UniProtKB/Swiss-Prot annotation:
Gene Ontology CC: one annotated term: extracellular exosome
Record's protein name: Phosphatidylethanolamine-binding protein 4
Residue ranges with Basic and acidic residues bias: 209-221
Region named Important for secretion: 188-227
Keyword set, alphabetical order: Glycoprotein, Secreted, Signal
PANTHER family reported for this sequence: PHOSPHATIDYLETHANOLAMINE-BINDING PROTEIN, PHOSPHATIDYLETHANOLAMINE-BINDING PROTEIN 4
InterPro entries the UniProt entry points to: PEBP, PEBP-like_sf, PEBP_euk, Phosphatidylethanolamine-bd_CS
Subcellular location: Secreted
Leader sequence residues: 1-22
Ranges for region Disordered: 202-227
Entry-listed glycosylation sites: 169
Function: Promotes AKT phosphorylation, suggesting a possible role in the PI3K-AKT signaling pathway.
Length: 227
């Protein structure tokens, strides 16, 4: 291989590494901003990967490279739970607790994705293969509704047959997630995480919420999700 070809190959590999790793200077407008305060308590053991962004868990989708628009059309992310047990089966839930807005969440929870019967060995590798009760719906926060949290939960299924009620299948909004969990005695999640984004047409100068002093304290993950 000639030196010219080697230089071209090296340049291509370097560019690929930069895209895959998503490394950005902390002062760059495209740097991933981490969630703060109580929102970080939600991030426990789960990893969520989108194209170009990498692991977006516990971060804000940056307002650069049209990421906030791209994420509305990307297919489902890769979800990994490194702590999954090979012989177990799991349930994956993705919801938006801030529908139509975090200030007035009248349609909490909006169900974006629900998959059951996921093998632990697959979940550990990021392969979400199972019974899809609600097909993946990409984050699409309404204009002027502020930042939305997109939350992912993994529950241990323990051989239970999981299903949605007919009325739950009619709409994704105003889903009574707590009733669903109680109906199947699912208990606390094995892992969880979340990220934030807002409508891509909204002002990029708006900051993701950092303080929630007016919101009540909660005792468990399911209650934290509802705040």
């Amino acid at each position: 291989m000639g030196w010219t070809m080697r230089l071209v190959t090296a340049a291509l590999l370097l560019g690929l590494m930069m895209v895959v790793t998503g490394d950005e200077d902390e002062n760059s407008p495209c740097a991933h901003e981490a969630l703060l305060d109580e929102d970080t308590l939600f991030c426990q053991g789960l990893e969520v990967f989108y194209p170009e962004l990498g692991n977006i868990g516990c971060k804000v989708v940056p307002d650069c490279n049209n990421y906030r628009q791209k994420i509305t059309s990307w297919m489902e992310p890769i979800v990994k739970f490194p702590g999954a047990v090979d012989g177990a089966t799991y349930i994956l839930v993705m919801v938006d607790p801030d529908a139509p807005s975090r200030a007035e969440p009248r349609q909490r929870f909006w169900r974006h994705w629900l998959v059951t019967d996921i093998k632990g060995a697959d979940l550990k590798k990021g392969k979400i293969q199972g019974q899809e009760l609600s097909a993946y719906q990409a984050p699409s926060p309404p204009a002027h509704s502020g930042f939305h949290r997109y939350q992912f939960f993994v529950y241990l299924q323990e051989g239970k047959v999981i299903s949605l009620l007919p009325k739950e299948n009619k709409t994704r909004g105003s889903w009574k997630m707590d009733r669903f969990l109680n109906r199947f005695h699912l208990g606390e999640p094995e892992a969880s995480t979340q990220f934030m984004t807002q409508n891509y047409q909204d002002s990029p100068t708006l900051q993701a919420p950092r303080e929630r002093a007016s919101e009540p304290k909660h005792k468990n993950q399911a209650e934290i999700a509802a705040c």
